[in-house]
Swiss-Prot record:
It comes from the Bacteria. It is an enzyme of class 4 (lyase). Pfam families: FabA. Keywords: Cytoplasm, Lipid A biosynthesis, Lipid biosynthesis, Lipid metabolism, Lyase. This is 3-hydroxyacyl-[acyl-carrier-protein] dehydratase FabZ. GO terms for cellular component: cytoplasm; membrane. It is found in: Cytoplasm. The active site is at residue 54. Its EC number is 4.2.1.59. One of its GO terms (molecular function) is (3R)-hydroxyacyl-[acyl-carrier-protein] dehydratase activity. The keyword Ribonucleoprotein does not apply.
């Protein structure tokens, strides 16, 4: 039995996600098991562009961006479940839905968010996932996320 972890650095992540600055919100994948789960991180710094207006005196990461980062983690898990190969050009996973989103505390500059997502089911290209975002082991956000596999014309 092997304890080898499946990881992804930023170079590998860029091969799977179409997002780029300022909307790429996953910095590293610490571990994943295709068809089961993925653990990724986002390092939150004061240099994030959204902190200029949210909020200048008391910077707080917008909750919708925490959810977007969680959705990006589910997209990575979906791709790794489909195949370990880099996806062909024009294949994307769209954020298709969200249920039971809850926010429990704020995320501030200096925090490191750990995203833990689990695949619940997949049917006809629609994946359903449960995700939690944690800072220092404390859940800051949880949600059920759906993503849809689509091929786009390039």
């Amino acid at each position: 039995m092997s304890n080898q972890m499946n990881t992804m650095d930023i170079t590998e992540i860029l091969k799977y996600l179409p997002h780029r600055y300022p909307f790429l919100l996953i910095d590293r994948v610490l571990d994943y098991t295709p068809g089961e789960s993925l653990h990724a991180i986002k390092n939150v710094t004061i240099n994030e562009p959204f902190f200029q207006g949210h909020f200048p005196v008391q910077p707080v990461m917008p909750g919708v961006l925490i959810l977007e980062a969680m959705a990006q983690a589910t997209g990575l898990l979906a791709f790794k479940t489909m195949s370990d190969d880099v996806p062909p050009p024009g294949v994307l996973y769209y954020f298709a839905g969200i249920d039971n989103a809850r926010f429990r505390r704020v995320v501030e500059p200096g925090d490191q968010i750990h995203f833990e997502v689990k695949m619940i089911k997949e049917r006809r290209g629609i994946g359903v996932f449960y995700g939690e975002a944690k800072v220092d082991g404390e859940v800051v956000c949880s949600a059920e996320i759906m993503c849809a596999r689509r091929e786009i014309n390039q």
